């Protein structure tokens, strides 16, 4: 299918903060009827039941998983709602893969090693924001502070900043569920991407996986109290 500008349309992402709504499932059905050959992505959710519902009745190809795990998201603090990202990925991946659907893990990525953990939990794709923030390619102005430090603003889509920018302010019946932070300027994004890709390659080497698809088959998770040696902080 071709879009208005003549570009071939291959993917459509139906993105809402709360995927636990019958309206979303009905909307996904209608989009599928309009776009029978397009890959449909929908979320966000964190549990088995709604994953199955979206795949079976919503006709979704890829489920987007994660509530409250983003670096600039405050949903868990404001609402008490959310689930540990790895636990959510493991539960939803089991349901999605059983129905021949795929899964994208959205949020919770702080270091390159977190990519390997997401893939190890069963994610087919990983979506991230904070590690890519602050680069030349990111939108927004490069701001120079009085001391010469350069930074860019990074904010959640449910933050005051986003709602003032896109919706004319925060509605009186709701609260902000995101924050705005200053991210030190990092330069070109390619260096960060190379670092992340290198981390994933090393993950595969350590656990004996020949490709990303095999990481979940080779990974074993162990609960620890301290992930790294903090002698030199």
Stretches found by the model and what they are:
Residues 14, 63, 211:
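Short, conserved catalytic/metal-binding motifs centered on acidic residues
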Residues 15, 19, 188-191:
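Short, surface-exposed alpha-helical recognition segments that flank or form part
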Residues 60-69, 128-129:
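Non-cysteine beta-strand/loop elements that form the S-adenosyl-L-methionine
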Residues 1, 16-39, 45-54, 70-93, ...:
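Active-site-adjacent beta->alpha loops and helix N-cap segments on the catalytic face
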Residues 8-11, 31-46, 62, 95-107:
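Short beta-strand/loop segments at the ligand-binding rim of alpha/beta enzyme cores
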Residues 58, 80-105, 109-233:
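Alpha/beta catalytic cores of nucleotide-metabolism and tRNA/nucleoside-modifying enzymes
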Residues 32-34, 55-60, 119-120:
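Short, surface-exposed basic-aromatic patches at helix termini and helix-loop junctions that form
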Residues 1-8:
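Active-site-proximal beta-alpha core segment in soluble small-molecule metabolic enzymes
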